[in-house]
């Protein structure tokens, strides 16, 4: 508290961290610590900031970082519609993929590095984050913002065509019509990928895919809409568009080269398809 009895920025940040930990639905106590230690304002550029709500841009009254510790989008590049995502949604993403010390993570779409920093904190000690950003200006900002962090490689490039290293988790911050096969193939055994699946104008779901001994399990988690991922947003690759109910029913995803679509298919793409049958039934 300040001398006047008002909450200090440290108090506000600490309470925000508690809310983030609760939003993650995780029992990992490290999450609250990470959310408290990584300062959001260090990645947003100088204030005042533009808060995005219902497609409107609202400028904060001042450059007081307290305005950033809310569940709000913060504009990073208004001309391109690129924002720093809603903290509670990302907390849920992080809780779902459950980063562990020593793991290798790939982040696709870094923005300016805030969630990259959180991931790097959670895979420490001994872990590494490969942060891939297709926008050169954002990649440069990410690199500058993360200069004091260890275990991070910032790569300016197209993650849909680049060769990716083997990874324990892949954290995607752009919407895809279907995830590229290369992303699934980069997963180590028990590796996890969370990705915003924007299968149609009516469907935007965060899905969690896990590489198991039987194949790739998949499940829908929550609504999620992100800026489209360049290179993975072509609707023409789809030969069967899922219904809303079908998209929510997914239980596995198969590479077409390994198995042809069958009667359990709810969505079919050029290189992979989603099934409503458990992966162990394949």
Language-model regions: role of each:
Residues 30, 36, 41, 45-48, ...:
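Generic marker of "main functional regions" within proteins
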Residues 2-108, 115-117, 121-122, 138-140, ...:
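Class I SAM-dependent transferase core
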Residues 2-14, 185, 197, 201-282:
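SAM/dcSAM-binding transferase cores
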Residues 46-47, 52, 72, 77-79, ...:
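Surface-exposed loop/turn and secondary-structure junction residues enriched for glycine/proline
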Residues 85-203, 208-212:
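Conserved nucleotide-cofactor-binding alpha/beta core module
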Residues 77-80, 144-169, 239-260:
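Generic structural signal for short, solvent-exposed loop/turn connectors between secondary structure elements
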Residues 50-58, 69-79, 129, 135, ...:
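Short, Lys/Arg-enriched charge-dense amphipathic segments
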